[in-house]
Amino acid sequence: DDDDLNGLTEWQRPFFVNWGSDAAQRAGTIRSDRREIAWPGLDENGDFLNDHNENGNLLPDYEEPFLRYRSDRPEFLFGLDMNHNGTIDRFENDILPDYPYKKDHSGYNAFVQVEVIPGLKAVGGRQNMRLLSGDGYTRSHYYLVTWVRSLGRGGRLRLAAHGARVKDDIPDDLRQWVQPLDAPGRMVDVRDVLPGLNAWKNDLYADVEQRIGPGVRIFHRLKWHWSQQLETAEEARQREGRKTSFFLGVINKAEWSIPIGLGVLEPRWKSEYRRERPFSTRVSFSESIEQWAILMWTQPLMAESVGVSYFPKYGRQLFSTELQVGIETGRLWLLQGMRAGAERDATSWTGVVQLRNQTAYQGYQIVTRTGGQLQRRNIKGAGSQDASTVFMTVTAGLNR
């Protein structure tokens, strides 16, 4: 069972259990704990770290000041849900062995794919499965249309549309990685509440990346999911569900890199809008807008090292020591309802100073980062929260 494809099984084996108290056995227990952690689809760069928590602290990168600009929440990303349990397939982790097909299942998935023009593909298919040892079944007709187009200046446009008519009463329970705010991440059991028992569902996704002039980049992302149960509203309520559920998320980003002398000034802006009505009645409806403005300054100091031929106005010089200063301000408008981590309107600001030094030592590249961070968050009707952090990290590697 290796759903995250990292070469380590996710089951706990008897010979990894800590039966005693010596150091070797304790180390074995640590390995066993790590084997139970899995985040399929969230390590696309293959570095064995969660792409949404690269620094391994108690905050996902999409919640952390400055890092949040590069990291978008997984619920804004596109993917197919072919087992109709409400979770994108590429993010799923279960406790089942990785057989070519699920045990106790019989059936087929047949589809036809046509490339209409280069970059534009259309798929239509039929899914039919049943349980061998029971009365469960899955039947669906579905379509998928995708379009990828290159834009000028290295830009790219991606569009995807997916829809399905589903009848599915086979539960596909999961064991998923969850990263709460200010708490260690953990694996939790996620029950399939059968949102595709008898339903129509549609997904629409689009993202576009553009370069406008020298040093200016913008990015837009849109995701819309809609599901309509074909049973009555009362029947849906009896199983703690809603007849109509949806998710609408829009992300806009812009950044500008401005060379000033040897330094670089980087203004950034990010906006995140989400409107969500989950299938489960245990989770409330919510609508919110969150925006951040970031200003970063990087100033080279001290010795300079040039790894390639450098000509003025063509390329960037590399400096062994850099001073980085940044400030981020953000605001959350909770328009309707509430969701986890967003119960009230809030404002925040964060300031950081970091000194980065890079040097070579016996064939290794050693990077040292030292700095401090101040943060204040004002929550409407609940006062303010202040936090300060002093940090120092040392990283050694063979690659520059």
Model-flagged regions — what are they?
Residues 126-132, 161-167, 222-230, 258-260, ...:
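Transmembrane beta-strands of outer-membrane beta-barrel pores
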Residues 122-204, 209-226, 234, 245-246:
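Eukaryotic acidic, serine/threonine-rich low-complexity intrinsically disordered regions
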Residues 114-118, 147-153, 165, 198-200, ...:
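Outer-membrane beta-barrel strand-turn architecture
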Residues 2-96:
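Acidic, glycine-anchored loop motifs typical of Ca2+
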Residues 107-113, 142-146, 201-207, 247-255, ...:
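Membrane-embedded beta-strand positions in outer-membrane beta-barrel channels/transporters
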Residues 118-124, 153-159, 216-220, 252, ...:
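Transmembrane beta-strands of outer-membrane beta-barrel proteins
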Residues 385-400:
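Outer-membrane beta-barrel "beta-signal"
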